[in-house]
From Swiss-Prot:
Keyword set, alphabetical order: Disulfide bond, Glycosyltransferase, Golgi apparatus, Membrane, Phosphoprotein, SH3 domain, SH3-binding, Signal-anchor, Transferase, Transmembrane, Transmembrane helix
UniProt organism field: Pongo abelii
Descriptive protein name: Alpha-(1,6)-fucosyltransferase
Main location: Golgi
Membrane topology note: Single-pass type II membrane protein
EC number(s) recorded for this UniProt protein: 2.4.1.68
Amino acid sequence: MRPWTGSWRWIMLILFAWGTLLFYIGGHLVRDNDRPDHSSRELSKILAKLERLKQQNEDLRRMAESLRIPEGPIDQGPAIGRVRVLEEQLVKAKEQIENYKKQTRNGLGKDHEILRRRIENGAKELWFFLQSELKKLKNLEGNELQRHADEFLLDLGHHERSIMTDLYYLSQTDGAGDWREKEAKDLTELVQRRITYLQNPKDCSKAKKLVCNINKGCGYGCQLHHVVYCFMIAYGTQRTLILESQNWRYATGGWETVFRPVSETCTDRSGISTGHWSGEVKDKNVQVVELPIVDSLHPRPPYLPLAVPEDLADRLVRVHGDPAVWWVSQFVKYLIRPQPWLEKEIEEATRKLGFKHPVIGVHVRRTDKVGTEAAFHPIEEYMVHVEEHFQLLARRMQVDKKRVYLATDDPSLLKEAKTKYPNYFISDNSISWSAGLHNRYTENSLRGVILDIHFLSQADFLVCTFSSQVCRVAYEIMQTLHPDASANFHSLDDIYYFGGQNAHNQIAIYAHQPRTADEIPMEPGDIIGVAGNHWDGYSKGVNRKLGRTGLYPSYKVREKIETVKYPTYPEAEK
C-alpha cells in the first residue's frame, strides 16, 4: 500500500470541509431572500468572508498539488510536515464553520445588546435632561442662574462620561477588542514588510531611487514630516528612498547617528540617469529622481495625505477611526526606529521620571509660534481637558494618581503649572531649556524633543494644539501603539492635518438650513471641504457644490475616505 493513501484522505477531508463551509454560506444567502433588508446589510460582510475562504481554499489546493509525488522512492520528512499543516488547517476550518453557525444563528452577543440598549437609553435620558434644565434656566436670574448653570454643566458631564464609558465597553464586547488588536497588528506587519522590501533592493545599482534631503528650513517635527512625505511618494512610485542627511542641523553626522538607517542595502544615490521630479509618468525612465519640498511639488501625485491605499481601505475603515493618520503613522514608525544608545536614553528617562499609567500628555508650544501660527493658551485651558479625561478614565480603571507629562519650550511654565496644580506633573525642565530658540538646533535639543515626543505618544490621552508639528508627530506615533487611538486627544486649535496635504473633504449625511448668515446650507451627499472644527458643535468649511463658505453642525457630516491605487508589493510576501 502506498504511504500517501492516508495523506490523500486528509486532503480530501479538508477540501470537503471547505466546500461544506462555502455551501453553508451560499445556503445562508438563499435562506435570507425572504428578508431582503437583512441580506443587504449582511451581504458585504458575507462576500468578504467568502473571498477570504476562496483564497484559503486555493492555498490548500496548491498544497495538495505539492503532495503529488511520482512513483518511486519517497522522502517522507517534508511531506509529513505538510500533512500536519493540513491537519491544522482542518481544525481551523471546523472552528470557522462552528463560529459562523453560531454568529448567523444567535446574532450578536448578550453583552453587546445590553450595552447597545444602555447607550440608547442614555441618549434619551440626556435629551430629557437637557430639555428640562434649559426650561428651568429661562426663569432664573442673577446668582441663581449662575449656580444652576454650573450644576447643569456638572450633571451634563456625568451624562456624557456615562455614555462614553458604555461605548468603550461596547467596543470591547463579544471579542471585538481582541479582533481589533489582531487586525491592527496584522495590518501593521503587512505594511512594514512592504516598506522593508522596497527599502532593501537586492541590487542597489539597478534600483529606481527617490532622493530626499532632510535639511528643510524648519524644526524637527517639520523635518520629520518632510521625510514622511518623501517616503510616501517613494512608496507610491516604487522607488527606494535615499535620505540625504549629512550636516543635518540637529546632528552633523546625519540621521543614522540617531535612528536606524532607512535601508540596509541601498544608501547610494548613484544611477545611470538623474533628474528633478517632473511627475510619475515623465520620470518613468529616470533611475534617480530628486524630490523638492512639498510646497514646490509640481505636478502633485495622488499619493499625498490624506489618501490611503485602495487595497487596505476597507480593513482600515473597520479597525481605525482615522485611516489617513494610521497610514502616515506607518512611515513614521519605520523612520524613527532608534539606535541602541537612544533606546537606552529613553529607558533611563522613563525610570528617572517615574513615568507610568495612567498619564495624560500635555504639550504647550510658546516662543516663536505664539502670535504667528498659534494663539496663546494659558495652562488652565489645557487642564480643563486633563481633568475631564481623568474623570472618564476613573469610570473604567483605578486612577491612583493624576499624572501629567508636560512638554513645552517655555522653561518658566513647569514652575507655574506645579504651583497651580501641585503633585500632577512629571517632567524634565532641562528639555524645556534645550527647546528654547537659543538652543533649538543642537544635539542636546534633538535628544530633548525626541524624549518629549516619546512620552507624549505613550500617554493615555493627549492635550495640545495641532498647529504644532511636535504634537501631531506624537499623535501619529500614538496610533502605532494602540489598535485605534484616533480619539485619544483634544486639540485647542486645529484638527489633524499633514502639511501639504490634498483637500480634506467631508460628506453631508443630514440636510442643514442656515439660521444665521454665518452658516451654509447642506443637502445629503454634498461635499464639504473642511477648514476646521470650532469644538463647539460647529465646523467651518466650503460647500463645494454651492461654493459657499461658512459654519455647519459637525454631526451632520462624515469623513470622505480618499483611496489611491498604491502598489501592493506582492514580492514582500515571498
